[in-house]
């Protein structure tokens, strides 16, 4: 039996787009012959998974797992092509499997995490449901007190870390993060480039035109302060009690904000615009050249 080398597996993966375990299995069956392995994969359903990989997966779920002592949380996003599949039990079971393994191993590197059993499960799921499935990102959050929240549709998940307080408080603030979507934790965290961009927008507003420089400067200061208050978590009115700022709520528990993470399914992914008439025509072999 021919020895299967890492280079052979790498070549087959690059040429087919299939997972490591499936490529290795194909090479073993082909006794190390890459071309034979490719031919056999083309005959089997194995290559179907690779073909699906070219399609945009912009639906899916965001999930959270928090440790029993509320000091560590893992938050992840797993994508599918359609919302219908995202609500399928098989898809949800896979997403939870990935989350649990990531949590147990303490792993946030998706490529490393997906080596072995999880990649085999992903490929099997692609075969079963006929859609591209991707594990997009996994983030670990640590702190003295950590709380997580997942919106009822599993599309938005968030985690908050505090220096003090309890799990219920951290979870409530995570719920606020999910609902309000602050840009930063505190005003000082706002990136300089975003501040400059906002200043340019304010300067261009009609009521700034023709005013003395000192008046413009004063108006600018007030509007920037408002911008920072609206977009900084600690300055926002708490969603469950708008009379209290989130920062004051945290302080009342003797704590401070360490940080937060909010994941929304599909954010930053450019969805494909599908021309269904053209797709049907192409499938029927009637598409025009």
From Swiss-Prot:
Chief place of localization: cytoplasm
Domain of life: Bacteria
GO MF annotation list: translation elongation factor activity
Region described as Involved in Mg(2+) ion dislocation from EF-Tu: spans on this chain: 82-85
The entry's keywords: Cytoplasm, Elongation factor, Protein biosynthesis
The keyword Protein biosynthesis belongs to this UniProt entry's keyword annotation: yes
Location relative to the cell: Cytoplasm
One GO CC term on file: cytoplasm
NCBIfam families per the UniProt record, alphabetical: tsf (TIGR00116)
Family: Belongs to the EF-Ts family.
Function: Associates with the EF-Tu.GDP complex and induces the exchange of GDP to GTP. It remains bound to the aminoacyl-tRNA.EF-Tu.GTP complex up to the GTP hydrolysis stage on the ribosome.
PANTHER family, A to Z: ELONGATION FACTOR TS, ELONGATION FACTOR TS, MITOCHONDRIAL
Protein name: Elongation factor Ts
Organism name: Marinobacter nauticus (strain ATCC 700491 / DSM 11845 / VT8)
């Amino acid at each position: 039996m021919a020895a299967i080398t890492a280079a052979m597996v790498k070549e087959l993966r690059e040429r087919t787009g299939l997972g490591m375990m499936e490529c290795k299995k194909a090479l073993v069956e082909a006794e190390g012959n890459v071309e034979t392995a490719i031919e056999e994969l083309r005959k089997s359903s194995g290559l179907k998974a690779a073909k699906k990989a070219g399609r945009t997966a912009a639906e899916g779920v965001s999930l959270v797992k928090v440790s029993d002592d509320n000091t560590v949380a893992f938050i992840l996003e797993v994508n599918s092509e359609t919302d219908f599949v995202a609500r399928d039990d098989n898809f949800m079971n896979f997403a939870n499997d990935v989350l649990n393994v990531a949590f147990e191993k303490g792993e946030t590197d998706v490529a490393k995490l997906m080596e072995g059993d999880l990649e085999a499960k992903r490929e099997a799921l692609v075969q079963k449901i006929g859609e591209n499935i991707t594990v997009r990102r996994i983030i670990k959050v640590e702190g003295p007190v950590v709380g997580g929240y997942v919106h009822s549709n599993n599309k938005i998940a968030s985690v908050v870390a505090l220096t003090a307080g309890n799990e219920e408080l951290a979870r409530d603030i995570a719920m606020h993060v999910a609902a309000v979507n602050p840009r930063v934790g505190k005003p000082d965290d706002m990136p300089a480039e975003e501040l400059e961009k906002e200043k340019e927008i304010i300067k261009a507003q009609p009521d700034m035109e023709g005013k003395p420089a000192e008046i413009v400067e004063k108006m600018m200061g007030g509007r920037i302060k408002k911008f920072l208050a609206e977009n900084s978590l600690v300055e926002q009115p708490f969603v469950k009690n708008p009379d209290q700022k989130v920062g004051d709520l945290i302080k009342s528990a003797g704590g401070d904000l360490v940080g937060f993470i909010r994941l929304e399914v599909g954010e930053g992914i450019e969805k494909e615009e599908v021309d269904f008439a053209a797709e049907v025509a192409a499938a029927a072999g009637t598409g025009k050249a």
